[in-house]
Structures are given as structure tokens and as C-alpha cells.
């Protein structure tokens, strides 16, 4: 399973939402993520990908869509 597929599965598992058709939609504004959900997602991403997500960066514009989350994880994996 690739990074994109894994992240989409994580989001679906945690929030019961299939975001594969809304890859560029703001997940906070769409109601998929809230503050607690964001923490859950960070913990799961760190666990699954063996990365450290800077919490101060996660809620910003560069982590608000599925595509941006995928890009951020890939970047952290290669850091």
C-alpha cells in the first residue's frame, strides 16, 4: 500500500469519511477534522510512518487537505 492509500485509509478508519473524492477540500471546514481529530490523526500518522509531525505546523494551510497531508508526510519521511 502506498502513502496516499494508507493516509486515505487512516482518515476513513478514524473519521468514517471517504475523502478520496475531496482531495483538495479543506478537511477542517468540511467537518472531517476538528481539534481532537487532528491530534488523533497526527498520532496515527507518526505511528504508521515513523515520523514526527510538528504540531505547530499541522493546523496551518499546508496541512488542511488530504493532498497536503500526503505531501507533508512524504516530505517528513525524506527529511
Curated annotation (Swiss-Prot):
PROSITE patterns linked to this entry: CARRIER
Q: For this chain's UniProt record, which GO biological process terms are given?
A: cell wall organization; lipoteichoic acid biosynthetic process
List locations, semicolon-separated.
Answer: Cytoplasm
Carrier domain residues are: 1-77
Entry keywords, A to Z = Cell wall biogenesis/degradation, Cytoplasm, Phosphopantetheine, Phosphoprotein
Which pathway is this protein assigned to?
Cell wall biogenesis; lipoteichoic acid biosynthesis
After translation, the protein is modified as follows: 4'-phosphopantetheine is transferred from CoA to a specific serine of apo-DCP.
> Its family?
Belongs to the DltC family.
Task: Say what the protein does.
Answer: Carrier protein involved in the D-alanylation of lipoteichoic acid (LTA). The loading of thioester-linked D-alanine onto DltC is catalyzed by D-alanine--D-alanyl carrier protein ligase DltA. The DltC-carried D-alanyl group is further transferred to cell membrane phosphatidylglycerol (PG) by forming an ester bond, probably catalyzed by DltD. D-alanylation of LTA plays an important role in modulating the properties of the cell wall in Gram-positive bacteria, influencing the net charge of the cell wall.
Check the record and name the HAMAP family matching this protein: DltC (MF_00565)
Protein name (record): D-alanyl carrier protein
Q: Which organism is it from?
A: Streptococcus suis (strain 98HAH33)
Report the gene name. Answer: dltC
Amino acid at each position: 500500500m502506498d502513502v496516499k492509500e494508507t493516509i486515505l485509509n487512516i482518515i476513513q478508519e478514524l473519521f468514517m469519511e471517504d475523502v478520496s473524492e475531496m482531495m483538495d477540500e479543506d478537511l477542517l471546514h468540511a467537518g472531517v477534522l476538528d481539534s481532537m481529530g487532528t491530534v488523533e490523526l497526527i498520532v496515527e500518522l507518526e505511528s504508521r510512518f515513523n515520523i514526527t509531525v510538528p504540531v505547530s505546523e499541522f493546523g496551518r494551510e499546508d496541512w488542511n487537505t488530504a493532498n497536503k497531508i500526503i505531501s507533508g508526510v512524504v516530505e517528513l519521511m525524506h527529511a
